[in-house]
């Protein structure tokens, strides 16, 4: 009962705060605040530099693979389990999924820099 009450109060509080932020007007939204600032001088170069979408996709792919490989880290401790065939099958399944997803990325040319 206490957990449900705390969860409901936290959810209502979060919703209330989100509604308040959408209803409040943007204070002092004049043009001077949205200009780039370089120590009081005019900017030397444009502040909005274009970002490479290819780099972004490779970085996201790297993060996903890095997190999936982190799932393999507890394997040395899992070797002490009594159900060894299940542990081996689950780790092989994870490695096969990693290999297939890497092959898919490679075939879709998601890892190529030049285009």
Swiss-Prot record:
Q: Membrane-spanning residues where?
A: 3-23, 55-75, 84-104
Indicate yes or no for the key word Membrane.
yes
MF annotations from Gene Ontology: NADH dehydrogenase (ubiquinone) activity
Q: Which GO terms describe its cellular component?
A: mitochondrial inner membrane; mitochondrion; respiratory chain complex I
User: Where found?
Assistant: Mitochondrion inner membrane
Keywords, A to Z, come to:
Disease variant, Electron transport, Leigh syndrome, Membrane, Mitochondrion, Mitochondrion inner membrane, NAD, Primary mitochondrial disease, Respiratory chain, Translocase, Transmembrane, Transmembrane helix, Transport, Ubiquinone
InterPro entries recorded: NADH_UbQ/plastoQ_OxRdtase_su3, NDAH_ubi_oxred_su3_sf
GO terms for biological process, alphabetical? aerobic respiration; cellular response to glucocorticoid stimulus; mitochondrial electron transport, NADH to ubiquinone; proton motive force-driven mitochondrial ATP synthesis; response to light intensity; response to oxidative stress
Membrane topology summary? Multi-pass membrane protein
Family membership noted in the UniProt record: Belongs to the complex I subunit 3 family.
Q: What does this protein do?
A: Core subunit of the mitochondrial membrane respiratory chain NADH dehydrogenase (Complex I) which catalyzes electron transfer from NADH through the respiratory chain, using ubiquinone as an electron acceptor. Essential for the catalytic activity of complex I.
Q: State what protein this is by name.
A: NADH-ubiquinone oxidoreductase chain 3
According to its UniProt entry, this protein's organism is Homo sapiens (Human)
């Amino acid at each position: 009962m206490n957990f449900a009450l705390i969860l409901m109060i936290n959810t209502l509080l979060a919703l209330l705060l989100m509604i308040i932020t959408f209803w409040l007007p943007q204070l002092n939204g004049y043009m001077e605040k949205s200009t780039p600032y370089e120590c009081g001088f005019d900017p030397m170069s444009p502040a909005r530099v274009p970002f490479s979408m290819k780099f972004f996709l490779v970085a996201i792919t790297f993060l996903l693979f890095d997190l999936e490989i982190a799932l393999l880290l507890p394997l040395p401790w899992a070797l002490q389990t009594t159900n060894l065939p299940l542990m081996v099958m689950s780790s092989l399944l994870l490695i096969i999924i990693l290999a297939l997803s890497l092959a898919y990325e490679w075939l879709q040319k998601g890892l190529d820099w030049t285009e």
